[in-house]
UniProtKB/Swiss-Prot annotation:
Molecular function per GO: lipid binding
Residue ranges constituting the DegV domain according to the UniProt record: 3-307
Disulfide bonds: none
InterPro entries given in the database record: DegV, DegV_C, DegV_domain_contain
NCBIfam families associated with the record: DegV
Entry protein name: DegV domain-containing protein XCC3382
Sorted UniProt keywords: Lipid-binding
Biological function: May bind long-chain fatty acids, such as palmitate, and may play a role in lipid transport or fatty acid metabolism.
SUPFAM superfamilies membership: DAK1/DegV-like
Length: 314
């Protein structure tokens, strides 16, 4: 059984992990003014687009997910030949059209795949499952890493699916934006009310940073802390505590809206790296996707893991 794993480009995982494990990426296109980039998780392209466009006018960006027809074409031209079963793991359907587009495309794919597969010499049926990760950005990485692990262990489709759906329900994505003015401007552009609890002007004047939590599809502020670096340090320390209590998978994903050297310099990050090593947990760090950066702003930090239900505490 050849199992394929598909994510969208909002999923924050390192480029080399994606390539090494043949994870297929559905690109999300980002347009700022006349500049357009289809995000294929290329960190250099993301950083150069960030420096050229996102920092100044990112809040005006329009993001366009892969359409129903584009998803259908990708599957019928390639994936129904290369794989027997595909898991398509998407960003929370409350944040994007991708889940709905992929679900709609799946009907056409399952209708039309037989002649394509037969021409390639495959007589067995093809199947796919679209799974809402119920999370975003670094949070999407948790289920994707586990899908790669379970596939490598040779597990069957049914236990993989059950495990991924269970994990999605237990994934926590924590995020600290650096610039509340940007976040408010972006929320206005999108008509998004999930960050409406933050008084942006007040927050920026006092250097208050919200800790946002994505969990079971909902994104909401769960704490207000003072200063970006102290807030990052508290989030890393909280993650270390959860690590020691025991996570549901040996995975922590970190996304940063800029150069990774800046992430490495944040207080508390070295302690998180050391704790991961001691506890046998893999730490995946990546430059945040372009989609992530235009939505939460340059220099934002996201940390995700799967754990039993809990509350955030600094």
């Amino acid at each position: 059984m050849r199992i394929g794993i598909v994510v969208d480009s909002a999923c924050d995982l390192p480029q080399d992990f994606i390539q090494r494990n043949n994870v297929i990426v559905l690109p999300i296109s980002v347009r700022i003014g006349e500049a357009v980039l289809a995000d294929h998780r290329d960190e250099e392209a993301t950083l150069s687009f960030l420096h050229a466009h996102v920092a100044e006018r990112g809040h005006e960006a329009e993001t366009t997910p892969f359409s129903v027809n584009q998803i259908r074409d990708l599957f019928l031209q390639r994936l129904v030949i290369d794989y027997d079963h595909v898991f398509c793991l998407t960003i929370s359907k409350l944040r994007s059209q991708i889940f709905d587009n992929a679900t709609q495309a799946s009907f056409a794919i399952l209708n039309d795949y037989k002649p394509v597969r037969q021409a390639a010499g495959h007589t067995s049926p093809f199947a796919l499952r679209v799974i809402d990760t119920l999370n975003l950005f670094a949070g999407q990485g948790i289920t994707a890493v586990e899908a790669v692990r379970l596939r490598a262990q040779g597990l069957g489709v049914a236990p993989i699916r059950a495990r991924l759906e269970q994990l999605a329900e237990h994934t926590y994505g924590y995020m600290i934006p650096r610039d509340l003015y940007y976040l408010r401007a972006r929320a206005r552009t999108k008509g998004d009310r999930s960050v409406g609890l933050i008084g942006a002007a007040l927050g920026s004047a006092l250097d208050i940073k919200p800790v946002l939590r994505a969990y079971r599809g909902v994104t909401e502020p769960v704490a207000k802390l003072k200063g970006f670096e102290p807030s990052a340090e508290k989030l890393f320390a909280f993650t270390v505590r959860k690590l020691r209590e025991g996570l549901m998978t040996p995975t922590v994903c970190v996304g940063y809206g800029g150069e990774l050297a800046e992430l490495h310099a944040l207080p508390g990050y070295a302690a998180l790296q050391a704790a991961c090593q001691t506890q046998g947990v893999e730490l995946f760090e990546s430059v945040m996707s372009l989609t992530g950066m235009v939505n939460v702003g340059k220099g934002a930090l996201a940390v995700a893991f799967a754990a039993e239900p809990h509350s955030f505490s600094a």
